[in-house]
């Protein structure tokens, strides 16, 4: 049983984030990252349970529908065509944040696969990450966006499958209302520039990422 002392020490999620979680009807179970790992090790949380830790809450991940799966595959193909061996592309794998362990659809992290043999990438490792949104757009904008901005993740893409566009968020700002200072929208006929550490590696046509 988890003690209240452990729970109350955690950073508080924003009111808007909690409101979105409640509106989506997701169950709330606030715990620490360490407790979350213990539950996984003990088999209380199984891989097939499809959940992730957001602001100390265990949240059930939505079922991946075919358009979502297809978009992830397309994104990975495009990224791998641009990037060298010094960058790691991780698909639906955990990242380590202060009170969360989300599993973004795609993450570009510095280094090699061996660098993450005994740990998950953290904000300092992450070049940018991508969430594919077909049924999860509100959650990706209202919960995950401030989460990633507050952790200082430099760049966040939302691939909006239904609107046929990509939202690119940069220049994170922390504080009580974390957000990204800059937003760029790319529609189906556009190409999204892939900029890593201030260097443009190329661009990806939006249409090539859409199912």
Placement of each model-derived feature along the sequence:
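Gly/Pro/Ser/Thr-rich low-complexity, intrinsically disordered segments predominantly at protein N-termini
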Residues: 1-211
